[in-house]
């Protein structure tokens, strides 16, 4: 999807297996930091040091999704942790991950709190795919808050002086027609399919590629 949207090849690198110098040598135009299936605690103590160095250098337009968003926040000093434990009697909406914790799970409207080019054409409450129980506990210093939900304040943020974005949701998990099964993450959340088209993530990604100068 990312190659089709951007019209450019997308090179895949693991969080811990790349360096700022390698990225400079590759001549990349933008950096997209994905979510993660493993818990952050399963990585080594310094596994993200180089990723944080890359993010702080901000030599290219950057966007992080879900866990990638959380690592951008961590690179700038924010605490990362679970939203909260479930209260007594509060139902757990899924047993797929993190039993006992509050989760945002499924297509969810987010409330735009500040305009930005990445949100062009999306209205005041675009719907994006959420699949998480952890969050950035604070907005990092030097960032602007762009969107929130009642359960997770830092849903979308941008560095004030550079096009460095973090999205707690998954913009890549969009659908273009009812029961669109082309995205594995959507299929995980909706095994029987999702009955509506939810294309806001596509628009946000296109907007990011425009901010990055990749799309006109």
Can you say where each PLM-predicted feature lies in the sequence?
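A SAM-dependent methyltransferase catalytic signature shared across enzymes that methylate proteins
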Residues: 7, 140-146, 210-213
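Glycine-rich, phosphate-binding/catalytic loops in enzymes
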Residues: 47-52, 79-82, 146-148, 183-185
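Alpha-helical elements of Rossmann-like donor-binding domains used by nucleotide-donor carbohydrate transfer enzymes
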Residues: 50, 144, 203-207
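Local cysteine-cluster metal-coordination motifs and their immediate loop/turn environment
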Residues: 71-72
């Amino acid at each position: 999807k990312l190659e089709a949207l951007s019209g450019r090849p997308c090179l895949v690198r693991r969080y811990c297996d790349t360096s700022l110098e390698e990225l400079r040598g590759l001549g990349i135009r933008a950096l997209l930091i994905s979510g993660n299936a493993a818990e952050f605690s399963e990585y080594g103590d310094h596994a993200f040091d180089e990723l944080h160095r890359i993010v702080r250098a901000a030599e290219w337009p950057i966007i992080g999704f879900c866990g990638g968003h959380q690592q951008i926040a961590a690179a700038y000093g924010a605490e990362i942790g679970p939203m909260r434990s479930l209260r007594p009697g509060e139902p757990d909406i899924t047993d797929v991950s993190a039993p006992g914790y509050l989760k945002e799970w499924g297509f969810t409207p987010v409330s735009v709190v500040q305009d930005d080019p990445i949100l062009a054409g999306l209205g005041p409450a675009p719907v994006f795919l959420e699949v998480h129980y952890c969050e950035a506990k604070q907005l990092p210093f030097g960032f602007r808050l762009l969107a929130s939900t009642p359960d997770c304040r830092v849903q979308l943020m941008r560095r004030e002086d550079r096009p460095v974005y973090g999205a707690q949701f998954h913009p890549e998990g969009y659908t273009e027609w009812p029961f669109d099964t082309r995205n594995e993450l959507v299929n995980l959340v909706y095994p029987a399919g999702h009955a509506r088209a939810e294309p806001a993530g596509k628009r946000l990604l296109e907007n990011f590629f425009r901010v990055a100068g990749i799309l006109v």
